[in-house]
Regions:
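Charge-rich, well-structured scaffold segments of protease-associated domains
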Residues: 3-8, 14, 61-214, 220-222, ...
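Active/ligand-binding-proximal structured segments within catalytic/core domains
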Residues: 7, 16-66, 243, 253-266
Length: 289
């Protein structure tokens, strides 16, 4: 791993026997940066970034190239990060990577596609309205601290993205899509030296705006609001109980992953486990942690 001159972090993986190559770009900003007046803006930007760049202006050029060369591409917006990724036949990593790099150098964010993608985002929102898992997730947010960004609506809709949204989109991109907020991973059949040269050539032009990481100081739950109980009527005929424990950030312990140990212990399904006992008592037929 290394950093480019623009402070963009890079991890390279060389596999001479690979028949596929891949790359992923993670930006350390997500829906936590949505303006109060534009819930879902980070997700909307994720959609718009695929639709042409100055170097490759055709809105479908990137998708067509990846698909024509045996690959697929996608992206997702989470609370604290946004991730773009693709895989492609190993022989086509360089041209794919060049197209990919332009997302973070000179995207068009073309006005003529704003309304189309606004409706696409709204369709994603509507598709999950009757999904019990999403309904439960949304209901849980209602008891969180409204001052914490995690409590906000993040998908986006025709209402939250109404009007002239492009200036807000450009402002968000210009403010947060900075090289110092990005981490790139590239895997290919080329040697590490060749991969490094490729990345330096294509990604050194990503501007470094010295963006400061977002820090949310408000507690996830306000003092005195816990313990709390939510009773949610599901649309499907299912019964479940979910126990949620807010904990302090363990980001500094990413290597040890302490919460994974707790999760594995609680979720163990063998002899003497919590699930085994619940099954014996006729109280549960499954458990996940």
């Amino acid at each position: 791993s290394f950093k480019l001159s623009n402070d963009l972090s890079v991890l390279l993986i060389s596999d001479p026997n690979a028949d596929k190559a891949s790359a992923a770009m993670n930006i350390a900003v997500g829906s936590n940066a949505d303006p109060e007046t534009r819930p879902g803006l980070a997700h909307f930007l994720e959609h718009m970034l695929f639709l042409g760049t100055e170097k490759y202006p055709d809105a479908s050029a990137y998708q067509k190239f990846i698909q024509a060369n045996g690959g697929h591409t996608n992206a997702y917006t989470a609370h604290e990060n946004t991730n773009y990724f693709f895989d492609v036949s190993a022989d086509n990593l360089k041209p794919a990577l060049d197209r990919f790099a332009q997302f973070f150098i000179s995207p068009l964010l073309d006005e003529k596609y704003v309304d189309r993608e606004r409706h696409a985002v709204h369709s994603e929102y509507r598709a999950k309205i009757r999904d019990d898992a999403r309904r439960t997730y949304s209901a849980t947010k209602q008891v969180m601290n409204p001052s914490h960004t995690y409590s906000n609506f993040t998908v986006g809709s025709l209402k939250t993205l109404a009007g002239d949204v492009r200036p807000d989109l450009v402002k968000f991109y210009d403010q947060y899509y900075s090289a110092n907020m990005m981490t790139l991973v590239v895997e290919g059949k080329e040697s590490l030296a060749e991969l490094k040269a490729m990345v330096e050539q294509m990604f050194s032009a990503v501007p470094n705006k010295q963006t400061k990481p977002i820090s949310v100081k408000a507690p996830l739950f306000e003092t005195g609001t816990l313990p709390a109980r939510l009773s949610i009527k599901t649309l499907k005929d299912t019964n479940s109980i979910t126990l949620t424990f807010p904990v302090d950030s363990v980001r500094d312990h990413w290597h040890e992953k302490p919460l994974h140990y707790i999760s594995d212990l609680v979720g163990y399904e063998g002899h003497g486990s919590l699930l085994a006992y619940l099954k014996e008592q006729g109280l549960a037929d499954g458990l996940s942690s």
